[in-house]
Regions:
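N-terminal glycine-rich phosphate/adenylate-binding segment common to multiple enzyme folds
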Residues: 3, 12, 21, 175-220
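Helix-enriched interaction subdomains in cytosolic or periplasmic regions
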Residues: 20-82, 318-325
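Glycine-rich oxoanion-binding loops at beta->alpha junctions
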Residues: 49-96, 145-196, 241-243, 248-264
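Short glycine-rich or small-residue beta-strand-to-loop segments that form or flank ligand, phosphate
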Residues: 102-112, 168-173, 196-202, 277-282, ...
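Short glycine/serine/threonine-rich phosphate/pyrophosphate-binding segments
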Residues: 112-122, 145-146, 179-184, 203-212, ...
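Accessory alpha-helical/coil subdomains and C-terminal extensions
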Residues: 200-202, 208-212, 216-217, 221-225, ...
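Phosphate-binding loop/pocket of nucleotide- and phosphate-handling active sites
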Residues: 545-546, 550-552, 556-560, 612-710
Length: 710
């Protein structure tokens, strides 16, 4: 190349743009990508053996739902299976293990970091067993199965995606194979391709699909294996005795780390310019696992956990009801108003020590844990459905504006006062509803989906909560409760530079004036320049006809807080992130596990790794019976057999540690904040997290009895 910056040498721009060096610098393949593609995740010891067998174990038991037994008769007797290594099995077992197979794989639902390594692990394992094995990737999710749309996955394909995030290799989709016609199409595709096995990588719904497909294809000899995927972390499996068999789904650790890194950047920002509260909503509609992990990773000033709010009991209201000889069912579960008060308390306490800034983490599904919101949704669903069933026009056409709808609800509240039998919408409902911000009222009253259900995903959870917070903070400011703390040094310097005696004015200005206090709070009665002067006159530090001294007015204005917010949503960026070492390794071993299950004839099983909460050397690949994990749940207005999702256990060691430390992390004291820097995601190196903090803490506290140390 002729370098343009070499002395005495020049070249045209056209020549410069065509050089190899320019192409190298601007290539799609960065050095970081090259290193990722070449990273080789370690294998569990069992997978280092040339052959693998399955060992049925009666060690773990489940409560099997009668409906699961009814609808999944051919796979419901499955048990937990351990993968065992074998160097030289019997010839029959060896032939079974190494026979040529056609295997299909599909991604279902949203992306989760590590999916490509499931494919890589499966591909490597099956090629080791028999180089003639073939792997077909169905494109665009389950639609690829229904439409027989696939690619054959080769070594070059796999090598192009090792350790990378996203589901770009074969894409994904949310279609469910949940009807007889779809089942028939899926079966036709599997039989046309002469598949020996189908692997479904997905969340609770997708693994439910895997169970029903396993049942449907059982007589055709097509095995179906599920793989636990969801960044929400709500696929967790325990047996009836509480033994952890699958501590978390893949993708969770990477998403949490990605969110944590971004949230920590905001911690650095807010503590630098000290004027914003950053409101961070993180994915997790059904469970708050991501919010809890981010809280433990970063130590934000306030982190809300939906499951804890749902578990709240208002003892004052219970006692009041007891005295009245009644039961107050609304005393169970925190109300929106109480949630807003909780946040306001933290904001006010921080402002009092000069920290009118901070970071709040809110789980996406927070509103689903608020009892009053669920009650509102049930009642409004009933009101709207009843209206549509009894009138010639529908509710939303008859009442097009928010005010029209609110007036109709007011009429119903008046009816409840006149007729005690009318309980669908009473005065208390109306009063609580009118406290909500207009946009949230509008959201709760929007048109239902085709099944008559409320569309929760359309709600801006963070703005709903913070709208109430801002209203209450204004009220607290008007009452003189919400104030910025003033440092003694700043106060004395301002006064002395203005030629005033700080000790003369201090008792008139501040609540508990002591020259050795770290921070001073202006009296609650001083809420305006007018009340400031009244206090100064009352304390006889100025005469009624005197103006307020400029330094005193400056101090007052500094005490008046300005509540400024910035909103952030963390979801899609985390689920598309390149995976951590934990997820790279977890998923690569899951892929190997999938082949071991297939090679030994398993079907209706979910590949899993036991002991994820422990060090890598203790990981134990197993197969879990999906049918035994099913329960009935309301979906789309009817009870449906689905795989159960796990919520945050507020009795767990991880949550207990979080609860014990959150007041320290609020940092409502003079001095530095307690923010933790998790650092960027890596796939190797001593600085990389070995596993999620929630898993580490739960393992550390596994022998601690509830209540110990309290």
């Amino acid at each position: 190349m002729t370098k343009k910056n070499d002395p005495g040498i020049s070249c045209s721009m056209e020549e410069f743009l065509g050089t190899d060096e320019v192409e190298s610098v601007t290539s799609n393949t960065s050095w970081a990508l090259k290193e990722r593609l070449s990273f080789k995740p370690p294998l569990c010891d069992v997978f280092r053996q040339p052959f693998h067998l399955l060992e049925d174990t009666g060690e773990f038991k489940f409560h099997v739902h009668p409906e699961a037994r009814k609808h999944l008769p051919d796979i419901i007797e499955n048990v937990v299976q351990k993968i065992a290594g074998n160097e030289n099995p019997e010839e029959t077992a060896k032939q079974q293990y190494t026979k040529q197979r056609n295997i299909g794989i599909v991604f279902s639902g949203g992306p989760a970091p590590g999916g490509h390594n499931v494919i890589a692990g499966l591909y490597d394992a099956m090629i080791r067993a028999n180089p003639d094995n073939r792997l077909f990737g169905f494109l665009m999710g389950p639609d690829g199965i229904l439409e027989n749309n696939y690619i054959e996955i080769t070594a070059d394909t796999v090598d192009s995606y090792r350790n990378l995030g996203g589901f770009g290799m074969i894409k994904t989709g949310r279609t469910k194979i949940d009807s007889p016609s779809k089942m028939k199409k899926a079966k036709t595709t599997c039989l046309t391709l002469e598949l020996d096995a189908l692997v479904i990588v997905g969340g609770d719904d997708s693994n439910t699909n895997a169970a029903f497909l396993a049942q449907e294809l059982y007589q055709d000899g097509v095995q179906v294996i599920g793989v636990p995927k969801t960044i929400d972390g709500d696929i967790q499996v325990r047996d009836v005795n509480g033994n952890s068999l699958c501590a978390v789904s893949f993708g969770f650790h990477t998403a949490a780390r990605a969110f944590a890194h971004n949230v920590n950047n905001l911690c650095s920002d807010c503590s630098s310019d000290v004027k914003y509260w950053h409101i961070c909503k993180v994915m997790g509609r059904v469970a708050s696992h991501l919010a809890l992990e981010v809280g433990l990773q970063v130590h934000p000033n306030i982190t809300l956990i939906g499951e804890e709010l749902a578990d709240f009991i208002d003892q004052e209201r219970i006692e009041k009801a007891k005295k009245e000889g009644t039961t107050d069912y609304t005393a169970y579960g925190m109300t929106l108003r109480q949630v807003s008060r909780l946040i306001c308390d933290g904001i006010v306490r921080r402002a009092a020590v000069g920290k009118n800034y901070g970071v709040i983490v809110i789980p996406e599904g927070l509103l689903e844990f608020i009892n009053e919101i669920q009650v509102f949704i049930i009642k409004l669903n009933t009101i709207i459905a009843d209206y549509n069933n009894t009138h010639d026009t529908d509710f939303h056409s008859q009442f097009p504006t928010l005010e029209d709808k609110l007036e109709y609800l007011r009429q119903m509240a008046r009816m409840s006062r006149e007729n005690r039998m009318f309980t669908v919408w009473n005065t208390r409902d109306d009063d609580l509803f009118n406290v909500l911000p207009d946009f949230f009222q509008e959201g709760l009253l929007t048109e239902r989906d085709s099944h008559g259900n409320f569309q929760f995903s359309q709600m801006e959870t963070d703005r709903v909560v913070m709208g109430l917070v801002e209203d209450y903070l204004k009220m607290l400011a008007d009452r003189g409760v919400y104030k910025n703390g003033i440092t003694v040094e700043s106060y004395r310097q301002t006064m002395e530079e203005g030629g005033l005696d700080p000790d003369l004015y201090g008792p008139a200005l501040f609540r508990d004036y002591k020259p050795d206090n770290g921070f001073l709070l202006v009296k609650e009665s001083i809420v305006s320049v007018k009340t400031l002067k009244q206090n100064l006159v009352k304390e006889e530090v100025i005469d009624p006809d005197e103006d307020i001294p400029k330094p005193v007015e400056t101090i007052y204005k500094q005490s008046v807080p300005k509540f400024k917010t910035q909103y952030h949503f963390y979801g899609y960026d985390g689920r598309g992130n390149d995976p951590t070492w934990f997820d790279c390794t977890y998923t690569y071993n899951l892929g190997n596990n999938v082949f071991s299950l297939i090679a030994n004839g398993a079907t209706g099983q979910m590949a899993a790794i036991r002991n994820l909460e422990k060090e890598f050397k203790d990981w134990e690949p197993i197969g879990l019976p999906i049918g035994s994990l099913m329960h009935l749940e309301e979906r789309m207005g009817k009870l449906t057999l689905v795989m159960e999702r796990a919520l945050v256990d507020i009795q767990s060691p991880a949550f207990s540690v979080f609860a014990a430390k959150r007041d320290r992390w609020l940092a409502a004291t003079p001095g530095e904040d307690c923010y933790r820097r998790p650092g960027p995601i890596r796939y190797a190196g001593e600085s990389e997290d070995a596993r999620p903090i929630t898993l580490i803490l739960n393992d550390l506290g596994s022998d601690v009895r509830p209540g110990d140390g309290s």
